[in-house]
Amino acid sequence: MRRPVVKDEIVEFMRHRQEQVTGSLKELENFARKENIPIIPHETVAYFRFLMETIQPKNILEIGAAIGFSALLMAQHAPEAKITTIDRNPEMIGFAKENFAKFDTRQQITLLEGDAVDVLSTLTETYDFVFMDSAKSKYIVFLPEILKHLKVGGVVVLDDIFQGGDIAKDIMEVRRGQRTIYRGLQRLFDATLDNPGLTASLVPLGDGILMLRKNQAEIELPDVD
């Protein structure tokens, strides 16, 4: 994300001081930078590396494959995991297919094509880790279905939820073109941050991460229609 919410010097320290990616991930990182394709920044990469090696999830769902960088990162650090990733952008799907064919050596990753709203309703499996990195205004729309497919004790990570700092402002201070995202994120926070069925944490990495842990089988959420 190009709008970090932490001081620039701290961001630079985190990006340069923590272990760098190598091999296939470095190749994809360089490609994304050259083509100006958003992928998770290095401070988030380091955090994901820690999460994967600590949690060791067995069944991962990702919303937003892009070029496949984050799915391949998770596969590398959770080698026993099966990963299902969803994307609807034809160009990104093309990149992801190429990269999975080249770098997914353990054949851990399955790519599903289509709008997440439609694809989620067809899933029959349960997951212990979900990564959402797609349309921010739709996070609250996707969440009910995500939670249905999440095991008790499972974790959801939602990326880029600070909107470059806009979420801390009054809506009248937010540019008109960003207000739909703003409203969607505020509804997301209202539904999750004080929800007794969830443990929630806001983490200032990149443009912000929301982490959720599912604590009980049934989670009540406000109507999102």
For every predicted segment, state its role:
Residues M1-F131, K136-V157, I161-D225:
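A short alpha-helical cap/connector motif
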